[in-house]
A protein has these predicted regions:
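Small-residue-enriched flexible segments
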Residues: 1-38, 42-64, 68-363, 368-397
Length: 397
């Protein structure tokens, strides 16, 4: 039994043709006789996403499809901007099912219930076939917030039987619309997911390159993506005081770059932080973050170097390969944070890709930059992370 993965890239002005071009290239790599069992799509917001999906489906037919809008795409061939990337998986060693949860803000519990209703991980047929390793690959609207709650609800609905790996959709750092893709549909306020059942574990790895600086503080007021107060003071005042200690006057155009270089680390267990990218200030001194920081959370400010950010991708890849337990590699999905791309630029992103390839060699790879990474990996991490790299490695057998 074997699993094969192929990738393709589409570029140009015409959305339908870009989707078709990427899908044709991906299917050519898995072989002319193979049919795709799962199609994964990352597409720049420059395109008409409905037309992109029609172009892809003109090639892949009714194969299960999930994906999301992105903020930069890449494959093993190199880094691309404003493109369409398609990954196609064909396997007689894995079983796939896809689901969709709509209306996350209105009824999260119902959305998750709908999405996983067709999953078969605990069925007698799956157990008899030896498909005892269960993974959910998911993509969520990147502007909807609630990533932590989504992971928690998925864990409850699936009785902690699955590892989770995925990302929050992006839109080239415009922060306007971040849809997800399900079969023929382009959806907001939704998440999409694929159940992956396998005899061999998938390799999941997540890593970041940030270190805490300064004292531990408490978020005393927050609402959704907005941190209003830290230690009882406006959040921006805390940053201004910290900046003065670094010899920086935090005013005008200096504010946003300083926030992006000193993000929040939410202390979720001793010695570990869930990263939250700080984006921009509001007039009342609040700070908008890329993902939620709960009221009452203990936090520290975080700092990184360009080199530590670039090396994150290689570390995540090594962790993923360790989880494969020496199984041969069929291909990888890599999910990076747009904050990394904004920090290190296109040249740095190319170095990140090289970091992955230095670890895994010339293997099929599809990835994108988005607005956060979603994960549940046994013994390491559960929840939503920003400014990080997440890798999902598919075993060949």
């Amino acid at each position: 039994m074997a699993t094969r993965m192929g990738t393709g890239v589409g570029k140009g002005e015409a959305s339908w043709e870009c989707g078709r071009e990427a899908a044709q290239a991906a299917l050519a790599e898995i072989g002319p006789a193979a049919r795709p069992d799962l199609v994964i799509v990352f597409a720049s917001p420059r395109y008409d996403h409905e037309a992109v999906l029609k172009g892809i489906r003109s090639v892949t037919g009714q194969a299960p499809l999930i994906g999301c809008s992105s903020a930069g795409e890449f494959t093993e061939r190199g880094v691309s901007s404003q493109s369409v990337v398609v990954a196609a998986l064909s396997s007689d060693a894995m079983r796939f099912a896809v689901g969709c949860g709509r209306g996350l803000r209105q009824n999260l519990s119902r959305a998750v219930e709908d999405a996983v209703s067709g999953f078969r991980g605990a069925s007698p047929e799956s157990l008899k076939a030896g498909l005892v390793n269960r993974t959910i690959l998911l993509f969520a609207d990147g502007l909807g917030g609630g990533g932590e709650a989504l992971i928690d609800e998925l864990m409850v609905r699936t009785a902690l039987q699955y590892e989770l790996a995925g990302g929050a959709a992006g839109d080239d750092a415009k922060f306007q619309k971040t849809p997800v893709f399900y079969l023929d549909d382009v959806l907001t306020d939704a998440f999409v997911c694929a159940e992956i059942l396998s005899t061999t574990p998938l390799g999941l790895g997540i890593s970041h390159g940030w270190s805490p600086i300064g004292p531990t503080m408490r978020v005393t007021r927050s609402e959704g993506l907005v941190v209003k107060q830290i230690n009882g003071r406006p959040a921006l005042d805390i940053y201004r005081e910290f900046a003065r200690q670094q010899g920086v006057t935090l005013e005008g155009d200096a504010v946003v770059p300083f926030l992006m270089e000193h993000i929040i680390g939410w202390i979720y267990q001793e010695g570990d932080q869930k990263l939250r990218v700080t984006l921009w200030p509001l007039e009342d001194g609040s700070i908008v973050c890329a993902s939620e920081v709960p009221e009452g959370a203990l936090i520290r400010l975080m700092k990184a170097t360009d080199r530590s950010v670039i090396e994150t991708s290689g570390r995540a890849s090594r962790l993923a390969l360790e989880r494969l337990q020496s199984a041969p590699l069929a291909g990888m999905i890599a999910l990076e944070c747009v904050s990394q791309r904004l920090r290190v630029g296109e040249a740095g992103v190319a170095q990140q890709l090289q970091q992955i390839q230095d670890v895994v060699g010339p293997t099929p790879l599809a990835g994108c930059h988005g607005y956060g990474q979603l994960a549940r990996t046994r013994g390491t991490f559960t929840g939503l992370m920003s400014a990080s790299a997440l890798v999902c490695a598919f075993p060949r057998a």
